[in-house]
Amino acid sequence: MPMLEPSALDQLFHAARTHNVWLDKPVDDELLHTLYDTVKYGPTAANSTPARFVFVKSAAAKERLIPCMSAGNQEKTRQAPVAVIVAYDTQFHEQLPKLFPHTDARSWYAGDQAKINAAALMNGSLQGGYLVLAARALGLDCGPMAGFDANKVNETFFPDGQWKVNFIMNIGYGDAEKLHPRNPRLSFEEACKIV
């Protein structure tokens, strides 16, 4: 596999920023389909792909979501073209006969809800990371958020309890003029070991 050009790494990582202010430019539904059709190929344990994505675009759906957000995240969510509820399916293992057919992977989880939830959260979080990178690769900016009332989101959007919110991410076309200076990151020596 060839190494990506530096410009591609810049778009995905080095020059990419978390956005909180958005241009008044819509995100087409077709692009959201392309986004998911890219994300779904990211690796997960046993191809479990437990993440579920709710693309909140309409004014009516936004008005349901905004009261679930913390005060500091309400206006940015209102302004963003799309707010994505990144959720996970607490019954993802029921899809394993289709997604991982060469062995009985469903039996690894059946009847153990704690194990199901842990695997769903871990692998769904991986997929949420893929969503960030795929969005950036497709020319979109992202603003992941943890400031929301998870119980309220679940009650509002997932009343049957099968899906659970993991985090929420605004996507669209960010206003680069409104970015703050970039915060520092830990060095290799601070964050890594080679053993």
UniProtKB/Swiss-Prot annotation:
Q: Name one Pfam family in it.
A: Nitroreductase
Identify the InterPro entries for this entry.
Nitroreductase (IPR029479), Nitroreductase-like (IPR000415), Nitroreductase_HadB/RutE (IPR050461), RutE-like (IPR023936)
**S-S pairs:** none
- Please list the cofactors this protein needs: FMN
- Keywords recorded for this protein, A-Z: Flavoprotein, FMN, NAD, NADP, Oxidoreductase
* EC number(s) from the headed UniProt entry: 1.-.-.-
The UniProt entry's coiled-coil ranges are none
One GO MF term on file is: oxidoreductase activity
Superkingdom as given in the UniProt entry: Bacteria
Per the record, the similarity remark reads: Belongs to the nitroreductase family. HadB/RutE subfamily.
What protein am I looking at? Putative NADH dehydrogenase/NAD(P)H nitroreductase Rpic_0870
- Per the UniProt entry, what species is this protein from, by scientific name? Ralstonia pickettii (strain 12J)
